[in-house]
Amino acid sequence: MGMEVPRASSPAVHNVMVANKSTNTGPELIVRRLLRTAGFPGYRLHWRIDEDGGRYICRPDISFPGRKVAVFVHGCFWHRCPKCNMDIPKSNVDYWSKKFEKNVERDRKKESSLRGIGWRVHTIWECELDDGASQLVEILKE
């Protein structure tokens, strides 16, 4: 069972929360454009990856199945970028603390599971889009 989502503190907060997207975010679109420009158009979006036994692992933002490369484009706020050290919202602190802990733990599990079946995992943080995408291009050139 999931956590109970608290009521938004105002209609404006509600509208902001409803507008948050989980796929095809601005940072994802930037990375995809950089990959196409660099000559790497053959990726899959939100491609399901299973273990050999069929157990579901995850759907990375971008995958190169033939190369076994999984790419996650993480927003600094939602995935708790270690460099940005974003503040936790002041209202509903318990809820947000638990949510962020679960997000970070889920990210760790995905990465560990993918590496366990031979995938290379590359995480690009929102605050480092250009550098992260450039590093990814170098990995793909190998």
Where are these regions (language model features)?
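Nucleic-acid endo/exonuclease domains
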Residues: 1-142
